[in-house]
């Protein structure tokens, strides 16, 4: 099968030196980019309905840039001033680096794992008399839940945002040789937008 068109279910990279640019030059293929899902923040009213009292938590568990953005967005909307003494437990260096958009980086209050909270076990246990809050979307990775529970700390989840299906109706009559997905939610979006989708000769690539 000769591949001429590819649809990537993610935003277009801002870097012109991405692997996709190399594919386009080398194989003369057309690559389009389109988000199949996107994130929406919950309203202050929706968060209040969860009875979240931010003042009770001196430690925040951050798993992604979205969790960072929506934690500070909703606390501002609810007029809660995040105390300077708040400690942040970041799943990765990328999350910790992004956190600097909102706070001054200090080693004493920002703890960074190597894509795994297990790396921070000793630090979590050090503060096991305090409460921890994890800002999340609709769900949290089961491995993270298992890890945090194993530390025997007092932690709670607060849904501050949600992942929703993007409108792809304008692609109804557009066909691609390959569709590339990066999460089950992307595939779910495909079938919610196009319930009668037939794969036929289209190739499906998953990451």
PLM ranges: what are they?
Residues 1-207:
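Conserved beta-alpha
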């Amino acid at each position: 099968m000769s591949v001429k068109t590819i649809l990537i279910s993610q935003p277009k990279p801002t870097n012109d030196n991405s692997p996709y640019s190399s594919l386009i030059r080398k194989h003369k293929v057309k690559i389009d980019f389109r988000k199949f899902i996107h994130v929406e923040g919950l309203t202050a009213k929706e968060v209040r309905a969860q009875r979240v009292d931010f003042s009770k938590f001196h430690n925040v568990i951050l798993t992604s840039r979205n969790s960072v953005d929506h934690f500070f967005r909703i606390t501002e909307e609810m007029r809660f001033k995040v105390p300077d003494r708040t400690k942040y437990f970041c799943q990765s260096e990328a999350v910790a680096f992004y956190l600097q958009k909102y706070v001054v980086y200090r080693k004493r209050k920002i703890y960074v794992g190597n894509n795994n909270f297990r790396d921070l076990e000793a630090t979590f246990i050090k503060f096991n008399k305090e409460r921890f809050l994890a800002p999340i979307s609709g769900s949290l990775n089961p491995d993270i839940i298992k890890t945090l529970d194993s530390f025997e700390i007092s932690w709670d989840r607060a849904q501050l945002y949600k992942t929703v299906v993007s409108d792809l109706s304008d692609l109804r009559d557009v066909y691609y040789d390959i569709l590339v997905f990066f999460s089950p939610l992307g595939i779910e979006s495909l079938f919610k937008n196009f319930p009668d989708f037939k794969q036929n000769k289209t190739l499906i690539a998953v990451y």
